[in-house]
């Protein structure tokens, strides 16, 4: 089974870049002192190898079979991984496997989801929400906040801590084969406001939001799951068009950002 190590391509850009990041939205109602005490105590109990392994989130099969359970047991008890991203499947299998995996782990596993419009993006037997392009036409952003809360509650029911959403890419290239309906639209302002409202809804119920695909995957013509798309624009264009939604997201105190698999010569011309 092919395994993808998500900690390299998927980078959590902690929002220490903004003043509000000193008090992230997700933690505004949390007991910071108690959390930090727990984290410090767990960290001190881990070996250097275990600390490194905590950075790894592995994509695994969502199939409740003896063979898959054996694979998961090895990853957790031998490799000491920090988290899981389940592939597509059913809610029943994922719930069973989540409970099984958590029972094996010395440190509670971080369970993640790539669910831009909720569980149904990955789990076949769950309630389905509209895709982002449809929601981009909604005039009232408070509805996007409530939508985010609904998705967050779905995640909580499944023991999911992190959702790799929202998409902050501006859908500016009609030849883009991979963003399209996943974007909230072609308006910079609309994408920013809709995505931030959705992310705040997620985080209001305790699910970490991870915006993507920094610094912007909207104006590409190739699929980053299959190759390395080129973003040919100048730094000036990037800072005026692609970057602003991510800056607004950071300034709102939201928690995580995923870096896209992109070739951006304006920032790094090396091959």
Q: What do the predicted segments below correspond to?
A:
Residues 1-27:
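Bacterial Sec-dependent N-terminal signal peptides
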Residues 22-23, 27-29, 33-34, 71-72, ...:
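Short leucine-rich amphipathic alpha-helices used at interfaces
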Residues 31-64, 70:
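Mature N-terminal segment immediately following signal peptide/propeptide cleavage
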Residues 54, 80-82, 106-109, 160-161, ...:
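Short, well-ordered coil/turn segments that N-cap beta-strands
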Residues 61-69, 73-194, 213, 218-234, ...:
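Enzymes and membrane/adaptor proteins characterized by extended Gly/Ser/Thr/Asp/Glu-rich
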Residues 201-210, 224, 237-256:
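Phosphate/pyrophosphate-binding betaalpha-module
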């Amino acid at each position: 089974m092919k395994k993808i190590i998500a900690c390299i391509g998927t980078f959590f850009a902690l929002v220490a870049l903004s003043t509000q990041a000193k008090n992230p939205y997700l933690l505004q109602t949390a007991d910071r002192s108690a959390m930090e005490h727990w984290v410090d105590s767990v960290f001190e109990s881990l070996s250097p190898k275990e600390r490194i392994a905590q950075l790894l989130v592995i994509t695994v099969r969502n199939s409740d079979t003896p063979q898959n359970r054996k694979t998961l047991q090895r990853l957790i008890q031998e490799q000491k991984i920090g988290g899981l991203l389940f592939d597509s499947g059913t809610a029943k299998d994922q719930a069973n496997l989540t409970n099984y995996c958590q029972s094996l782990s010395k440190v509670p596993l971080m369970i993640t989801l790539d669910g831009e419009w909720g569980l149904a993006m990955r789990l076949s037997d769950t309630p389905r929400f509209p895709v982002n392009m449809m929601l981009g036409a909604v005039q009232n952003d408070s509805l996007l906040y409530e939508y985010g809360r609904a998705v967050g509650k779905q995640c909580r029911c499944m023991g999911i801590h992190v959702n790799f959403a929202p998409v902050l890419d501006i859908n500016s290239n009609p030849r883009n084969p991979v963003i399209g309906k996943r974007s909230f639209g072609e308006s910079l302002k609309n994408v920013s406001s809709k995505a931030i409202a959705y992310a705040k809804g997620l985080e209001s119920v305790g699910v970490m939001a991870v915006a993507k695909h920094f610094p912007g995957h909207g104006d590409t013509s190739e699929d980053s799951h299959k190759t390395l798309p080129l973003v040919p624009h100048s730094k000036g264009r990037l800072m005026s068009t692609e970057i602003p939604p991510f800056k607004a997201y950071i300034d709102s105190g939201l928690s995580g950002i995923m870096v896209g698999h992109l070739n951006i010569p304006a920032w790094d011309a090396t091959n």
